[in-house]
């Protein structure tokens, strides 16, 4: 009898990259549905534009690099990059913005480094930050939730706003906001920071229509709960590990609680931090990117906690209302250092 000795690894994970990406895309459905419910069909249209751009640009670069196009596109990583960017930008942003951001994310932030598995920074967040720095006005032009919107644009108006900048009746973004008192910026985090800088107290800010008596903001807390539900699905399917989301949310919640207890008249409450902006999207769908996150369990805890601290610092003292994208990229920079000091010790090695 002949015994064959196989080389390591002796255990195999049968899940392919494409299957994991499909699970993530499936988990994103609740967040997309709820975000569309509160903010309109623009969310879906931005996703379609981002997906088409991601596939087209990735295919073009792969052709230039003389690599297999179909096999690479089937891993769905480009599609996920486009989706994460699309749900992060205002639903009525001009069409060319999501195209530009997605192309930059795929070509510069991903393929320039060698493709999937080689990029040190999260591509979607690179694309988002490029757009935010280059076009700050358009990137902060969110309409308030449809619950308090002065007028709800029809699907045809949404199409025209994205592709022409005007509705069929000639209205623009300013006219869609008309009649909503006290809203200069439509997201709760935008409104909170802008109003505090204008000299209003926290109690006065929370009386604005964008909050509607809900500390995390009308619509936004349900959007975050939907992304949380998708994240729990990923944990149940073991598509992601618990270390990064838990440490991120604990760190953000702890910092927000301490800050709020110390200065309740100038800092946001823990509830607002946890259920506003891109908190849950970042915790479960962005920070958990296996390529750009730490690879050890202790490292993941440190990585997530660091990102949570950075989000709180940027939101509370920085120039941008939501610091998730910047926090992710800054935490990505530290990954090699974190992995170096948290790598398992080899048995017998001093």
UniProtKB/Swiss-Prot annotation:
Membrane spanning stretches: 20-40, 42-62, 89-109, 123-143, 214-234, 242-262, 267-287, 301-321, 322-342
Top EC class for this record: translocase
Residue list for modification FMN phosphoryl threonine: 187
Pfam families, per database record: NQR2_RnfD_RnfE (PF03116)
GO BP terms in the entry: electron transport chain; transmembrane transport
Protein's cellular compartments: Cell inner membrane
Disulphide-bridged cysteine pairs: none
Cofactor(s) the protein needs: FMN
EC number in record: 7.-.-.-
An annotated GO cellular component: plasma membrane
InterPro entries, sorted: NqrB/RnfD (IPR004338), RnfD_bac (IPR011303)
Membrane topology: Multi-pass membrane protein
Stretch forming the signal peptide: none
Keywords: Cell inner membrane, Cell membrane, Electron transport, Flavoprotein, FMN, Membrane, Phosphoprotein, Translocase, Transmembrane, Transmembrane helix, Transport
Function: Part of a membrane-bound complex that couples electron transfer with translocation of ions across the membrane.
Subunit structure: The complex is composed of six subunits: RnfA, RnfB, RnfC, RnfD, RnfE and RnfG.
Family: Belongs to the NqrB/RnfD family.
PANTHER family referenced in this protein's UniProt entry, alphabetically: ELECTRON TRANSPORT COMPLEX PROTEIN RNFD, ION-TRANSLOCATING OXIDOREDUCTASE COMPLEX SUBUNIT D
Protein name as it appears in the record: Ion-translocating oxidoreductase complex subunit D
Species for this entry: Klebsiella pneumoniae (strain 342)
């Amino acid at each position: 009898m002949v015994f064959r000795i196989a080389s390591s690894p002796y255990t195999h994970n049968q899940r392919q990259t494409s299957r994991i990406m499909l699970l993530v895309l499936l988990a994103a459905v609740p967040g997309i549905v709820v975000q569309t419910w509160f903010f309109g069909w623009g969310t879906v249209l931005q996703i379609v534009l981002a997906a088409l751009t991601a596939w087209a640009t990735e295919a073009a670069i792969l052709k230039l690099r003389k690599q297999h196009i179909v096999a690479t596109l089937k891993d769905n990583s480009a599609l996920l990059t486009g989706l994460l960017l699309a749900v992060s930008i205002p639903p009525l942003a001009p069409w060319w913005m999501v195209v530009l951001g997605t192309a930059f994310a795929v070509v510069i932030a991903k393929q320039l480094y060698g493709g999937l598995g080689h990029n040190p920074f999260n591509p979607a967040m690179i694309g988002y930050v490029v757009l935010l720095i280059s076009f700050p006005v358009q990137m902060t032009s969110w309409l308030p939730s449809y619950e308090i919107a002065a007028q709800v644009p029809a699907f045809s108006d949404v199409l025209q706003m994205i592709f022409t900048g005007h509705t069929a009746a000639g209205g623009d973004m300013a006219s869609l906001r008309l009649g909503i008192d006290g809203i200069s910026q439509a997201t709760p985090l935008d409104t909170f920071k802008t109003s505090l800088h204008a000299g209003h107290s926290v109690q006065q800010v929370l009386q604005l229509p964008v909050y509607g008596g809900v500390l995390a903001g009308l619509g936004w807390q349900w959007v975050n709960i939907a992304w949380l539900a998708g994240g729990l699905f990923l944990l149940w399917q073991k598509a992601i590990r618990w270390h990064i989301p838990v440490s991120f949310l604990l760190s953000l919640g702890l910092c927000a609680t301490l800050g709020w207890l110390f200065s309740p008249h100038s800092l946001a409450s823990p509830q607002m931090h946890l259920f506003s902006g891109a908190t849950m999207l970042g915790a479960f769908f962005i920070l958990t990117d296996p390529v750009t996150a730490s690879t050890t369990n202790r490292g993941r805890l440190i990585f997530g906690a660091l990102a949570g601290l950075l989000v709180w610092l940027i939101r509370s003292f920085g120039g941008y209302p939501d610091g998730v994208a910047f926090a992710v990229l800054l935490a990505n920079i530290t990954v090699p250092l974190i992995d170096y000091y948290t790598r398992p010790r080899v048995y017998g090695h001093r």
